[in-house]
Amino acid sequence: MYTDQVPSNDMSRALASQYGFRIFGTIREALCLGGGTLAVDGVAFIGEHGEYPFNEKGQHLYPRYELYKQIIDVFRESGRAVAVYCDKHFSYDWTKAKWMYDQSHELHFPLMAGSSVPLTWRRPPLELELGSPVD
């Protein structure tokens, strides 16, 4: 795992301690598991946490493109690519988003995007009966 920023509400360190996974100092180290070449079977890319500026349109300038470029660099240098899941949209900028999309075609890897929220644990647990009204 790699985290670009570690805000006060970050859970990565506690979860790493609890479940025994490593946190690396760079994206390259995380994808290579500290070695010299790509060593993972897939990438879950969540680029929407931390303190980043806003542009004149009020868009939060999360560095998804810049972080994704580092993932692509590792793929290119390793001579192989793996599936990437991008939490949320690719970028606030069409040109950057298009480049991100195009890389999956050029390097022949599956690229998925959406929200990871439906896949997270509910704390406390909550199971609603099918057809239950929700306010």
Spans of model-derived segments:
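Predominantly a Rossmann-like dinucleotide-binding segment in NAD(P)-dependent oxidoreductases
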Residues: 104-135
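N-terminal glycine-/serine-/threonine-rich beta1-alpha1-beta2 phosphate-ribose binding loop
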Residues: 1-83, 92, 96-107
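ATP-grasp fold ATP-binding core
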Residues: 86-88
